[in-house]
Each structure stands twice: as C-alpha cells, then as structure tokens.
Amino acid sequence: IDENIENSLGQYVEGVPEHYCRVHGQIYALPVTPSVQILYYRKDLFESPICKRTYFEQFHEELQPPKTFEEYNRIAAFFTRDLTPSSPVPYGSTITLGSTGVAGSEFLARLFAIQENLYGADGQIHLDSLQCQQALAELVQLRRCTSPEYCGWWTQTARRFAEGNFAMSILYSNYASDLSSHSSHVVGNVGYSMMPGNNPVLGGGSLGVSKYCKRPKDALSFIKWMCSEPLCSASALLGSTSPCRRTYDN
C-alpha cells in the first residue's frame, strides 16, 4: 500500500516495531497500544518492618518481589488472612480468569517463567509437558490466596487491587492506570517489578489493513494517524500506553 511505510517506524520506542509491526521482517501493522505484564505489589507491606521480620522468621528469606512463581505463591499465602491470620490484607494476590483466553494469559505467565515460549525443542506445543504441568499447578495453587470472586478482565483486576485488599497483582501495563485514580486506596504505596522469570507475556495490539479492504490507502492513512503523535500522547493521558518515544520525552 505504501512503499515508504518503513519511515513511520522511527517514531516508536526501541523494540516495539520488532514485536508489533513485523512478521519475518515484513511490515504488516502499526502499534497502537503496546503493553507487557508487570508485577505490581503493595510497597508499604513489603517494606513493613513487622511483615519483613515475620516473613524472615517463617521462611528464613528476605521479603522482596518474587523472582519465581514458587516464591510468588509463598508470598501470596503469607499475605492471605485465611492462611496467615496476622496478614494486614485479606488476600495475597489477584487473579484474572474471565475467559479461556484471559485464563490462558495467567497460565502463559507461569509457563514463560520456566521456558522461553510455547514450543518444545521439536518445535511443537506439548501441553502435557512437565513445564506445562508445573505452570498449571502453580496457577491452581494460587486460588487459595485470592478472593473467591475472581476478576474477569484486567480493568476489573486493577480496580480490585486499588481497593487495598490485595498484596500483589499481575497486570498488563495498559490497564494499570486505575491504581493511581482518585478513588484508589493504594496511591503512593504501589511498587512494580519484572515478572517472575523475567519473560513476561506481551499484550496490547496493532492495527493493520485487511486484504479485503476496499479503500486500503484511506485505511492506512487512518491507522498512521491513530498510531502517531499527538494522538498517542493523548491516549496515554487517558490511561493507555503509547508506542511513541515523544510521549515519554514530554
């Protein structure tokens, strides 16, 4: 449609075009809301001298953001009042299970913490592998550390975490704005960290032109407008995540 489309990629944050624009080197789309899973936690709880001392006495380890999902579940249990009566909050972690696709995101977060991607050494997906079994087991174990009224979508998860009843939450970055909203009870007390395993699931989305489009040039013109400044900065102010470098330089 546009042989100069490559020129549109220079405005984006480093790394975004590779994940949101190209497939096997070919440009198929432009990024509109790039995002990534981030671990958010109650900084006031993790830095509490009482919580830190109690955790150390119980597990002989420092209380800090978890590096593995085994640690994540242990900390979640520590902050779940039904399991630890002295916990200052009712639940250790949120969980988002609204549909097969949403629940799959929780599963993949745990799988990617122990293997690079979905595929085994033979290039096939093996859901009965030991790694997949471990990821599923870690997800099932977390159910006892969260509210029985699980969240259906990440906006709901962010609102629930903002109520102040959870110690940790895994959210996509473009859904986290409610943590600092006027109604949030955790403003100033939210820390953030890389996901356990340092291999988070990417989220967000890109826009491309369908091959069935009757007016592809007009469609591409609209997409370029949607995926560039000043619109991306305006979207960021409304809680979205911008793909453009200029947003973060302002």
For the regions a protein language model found, what residue spans apply to each?
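Glycine-centered hinge/linker elements that transmit conformational signals in sensory
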Residues: 73-80, 101, 106, 110-153, ...
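Pocket-flanking alpha-helical
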Residues: 9-29, 70-88, 176-183
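Short helix-initiation/N-cap motifs at beta->coil->alpha
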Residues: 67-71, 149-163
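C-terminal lobe and pocket-closing loops
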Residues: 175-185, 197-250
